[in-house]
Structures are given as structure tokens and as C-alpha cells.
Amino acid sequence: VHAAVAAAAVMAGGRPLWETTDTEWDVLFEIGVRGVLNLARTAVPALLRGAQPRSGRFVALASAAAHRGLWHLAAYNAAKHAVVGLVRGLATDLRGTGVTATAVSPGSTSTAMLAATAALYDLPDVDEFAGYQLLDRLLRPEEVAATVCWLCGESSSAITGTVVHADGGFTA
């Protein structure tokens, strides 16, 4: 095993934090955070034993929402912030092993999950999210995937314990 990518996510909420249900909170953290933890528990030992010692890659998808509060999505913000913290802690634990751990924080990307988010806000069109990004368009999934692939490759060997913002300028 050379690389492991944690990319599972779910959208829940769409209401103020004080109205967020325990179920919504639990779903966000179970899938978005515990999923990363479970992959790390399984994949990191294999990365440490990998075919190319001292060169494994662990990448987790966070979100631009980890770095900027979003209206009525505080629980989602918190879950994605937890992913960033988990990756930073993992990178520290991997110090000196040659295995890196990084997070990618995409902005609004043209996916089914963004469509679900639009539905939470009763928006008729996901393109309304494009205005939050300096590129003034939605990201394409393949743009985010290219960032992840780069982080899984040798040319990113000096990148660990940090976040790569593939967010179209959302967090600028």
C-alpha cells in the first residue's frame, strides 16, 4: 500500500447550531471524522510496511468549511475542522517514518452533496454557491481529485501535517 485516501462525507443540518439534532451531529462525526480515524487505523500500519519504505501517503478530504464558518452549518464546520486536527495529529505521530498525512479542503464542488446542500437552503440552483469562490464557478470533481493524486505522489514528499486548499479562492 502506497496511499490511502479518506473521502467519505455527508451533509446534514441546514439550521442554527442550537437547533441541530443529536442525530445530525452524530451522523456528521460518525462518517466524516470516525471514518478518517478508522481508515488511519487500518491503512497506516500498511503504509508503514509499504513496498516503498518511507514514502507512504495518507490524505483526508476536509472542506473549506473547516476554515470559514458557514451559515446554519456549524456542525458540518466542526466535523471538517476535526478532520484537519486529526490529520495534523497523525502527521505528528508519523514523524520520522517517511509517511505523510495531509488534508485537502475543497470549496464548492459540483457534486451530489452540493446539490443536497442547496436543497437544505431551498436554493433552486447549485451554481449559486459559485459566487463564494474567487474563480466565480463551481469546482469540478476532477480538479479536487488531481490535488489528491498529487499529494499521493512523490513530488509532494515535503508536504505533511497541513492542508492544501483546492477551494477556488473560497478561503482567500
Predicted regions and their residues:
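Substrate-binding pocket helix/loop in short-chain dehydrogenase/reductase
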Residues: 15-17, 24-29, 129
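Active-site helix of classical SDR
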Residues: 40, 79, 87
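Alpha-helical segment proximal to the catalytic Tyr-Lys
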Residues: 45, 92-93, 157
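Short, small/polar-rich loop/turn modules that mediate ligand/substrate recognition or access, typified
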Residues: 55, 95, 100, 159-161
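Residue(s) in the substrate-gating loop at a strand-loop-helix junction
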Residues: 63
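C-terminal substrate-recognition "lid" of short-chain dehydrogenase/reductases
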Residues: 137-166, 171
